[in-house]
Design a protein with these regions (language model features):
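N-terminal intrinsically disordered, cationic/polar leader segments
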Residues: 1-51, 86-101
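A generic short-segment signal for beta-strand/edge and adjacent turn/coil regions
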Residues: 3-4, 63, 80
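Extended amphipathic alpha-helical scaffold segments
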Residues: 39, 66-73, 96
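Alpha-helical segments in soluble extracytoplasmic regions
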Residues: 51-66
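OB-fold and OB-like single-stranded nucleic-acid-recognition modules
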Residues: 55, 74-77, 101
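Short, well-ordered coil↔helix boundary/capping segments
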Residues: 56-59, 82-92
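Short, solvent-exposed, charged loop/turn and helix-capping segments
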Residues: 68-85
């Protein structure tokens, strides 16, 4: 009787152990915009210390772009996404390579 009371009423399937369901490319976009802004500020300054700081922040943000994209790629996308969007693999591969080169 206890098993019947405590048994789940429906079965759900999740991509991870904790089905948070929060996947949004917005954070990757924000970090990419930060990379672009750091590059522009670097170009607009003659201050070596400021430039060094801009490079450090840019590299940190570029790594965050890659991290956010990798989470989407490894945790969110499933084979059916690739079937529906055949260019998805190349898009994510190119995006992470670009972030690494930034």
């Amino acid at each position: 009787m206890v098993h019947r009371i405590l048994a789940p009423r429906r079965t759900v399937h999740a991509h991870c152990d904790l089905p948070c369901g929060v996947y949004d490319p917005a954070q990757a976009r924000i970090e990419a915009e930060s990379v672009k802004a750091c590059q522009e500020k670097f170009q607009g300054s003659d201050d070596a210390e400021f430039q060094a700081r801009a490079v450090s922040i840019k590299e940190e943000r570029a790594n965050m772009v890659k991290e956010h994209l990798w989470v989407l790629w490894t945790d969110y996308f499933k084979p059916e996404h690739l079937e529906k969007h055949p260019s998805l693999h190349d898009l994510f591969w190119s995006a992470t390579k670009e972030a690494g080169a930034a």
